[in-house]
């Protein structure tokens, strides 16, 4: 039941080091990585043989898979008892069949997932920004810096596929990820590196 909360609890470690979270805002539209995503990610990587891509095994790929399949959980679901229970009843049987019949992994009980979601709701509540569109409008005439991790060669569409991440870390991803319209982004700055580096999505060295 505690699986899937590890990264969330790192917040406490960061707080102990003096990191201030008062400006942290989480969109209610953000997808939630569930513990079964982490298990599926680890299993897939371990059984990929020569096709192994060096994933971080944090469940990111499977989370995107469920998002695209429209069977994922979003932050906003945590704060609607009816919506959350409906989603659990719809999604969990699908995931359990997959866990058992495809991956040979243990199934999750309904109570386990509901309890986990309740813990997520409590942990995230101080940071969820339900009026995020108003927040964007408030700063529309100001200069805002969007900083993206990773880079072009890890883009799921334009990178060194399949040795890529699951999203679009290119400039256009700033608009999709933030809710800002593409026309509102006036300048894109790319940072290049002539050295070899190890990508977050692959164990191989890539040259950029």
Can you say where each PLM-predicted feature lies in the sequence?
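Single conserved hydrophobic/aromatic residue that forms the stacking wall/gate
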Residues: 1-9, 197-208
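Hydrophobic alpha-helical scaffolding
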Residues: 3, 77, 106, 160-164, ...
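A structural-propensity feature for long, helix-poor, extended segments
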Residues: 3, 180-199
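Short, well-ordered loop/turn and helix-capping segments at boundaries between secondary-structure elements
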Residues: 13-16, 176, 180, 194
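Internal alpha/beta core interface subdomains
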Residues: 14-134, 144
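Acidic, glycine-rich active-site loops and adjacent beta-strand->loop/helix elements
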Residues: 30-32, 151, 191-195
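Conserved phosphate/anionic-ligand binding catalytic regions in large, soluble enzymes, centered on
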Residues: 54-69, 143-178, 196-199
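Glycine-rich phosphate-binding loop plus the immediately following alpha-helix
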Residues: 81-85, 170-185
């Amino acid at each position: 039941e505690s699986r899937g909360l590890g990264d969330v609890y790192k917040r406490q470690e960061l707080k102990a080091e003096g990191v201030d979270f008062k400006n942290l805002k989480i969109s209610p539209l953000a997808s939630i990585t569930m513990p079964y995503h982490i298990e599926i990610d680890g299993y897939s990587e371990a059984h990929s043989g020569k096709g192994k891509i060096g994933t971080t095994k944090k469940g990111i790929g499977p989370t995107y898979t469920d998002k695209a399949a429209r069977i994922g959980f979003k932050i906003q679901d945590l704060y609607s008892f009816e919506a959350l229970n409906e989603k659990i009843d719809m999604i969990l049987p699908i995931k359990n069949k997959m866990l058992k019949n495809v991956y040979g992994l243990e199934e999750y009980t309904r109570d386990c997932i509901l309890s986990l979601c309740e813990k997520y709701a409590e942990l995230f509540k101080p940071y969820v920004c339900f009026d995020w569109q108003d927040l964007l409008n408030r700063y529309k005439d100001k200069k805002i810096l969007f900083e993206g991790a990773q880079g072009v060669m890890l883009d799921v569409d334009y990178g060194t596929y399949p040795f890529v991440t699951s999203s679009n870390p290119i400039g256009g991803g700033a608009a999709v990820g933030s809710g800002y319209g593409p026309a509102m982004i006036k300048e894109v700055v790319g940072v290049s590196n002539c050295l070899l580096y190890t990508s977050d999505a692959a164990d191989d060295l890539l040259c950029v």
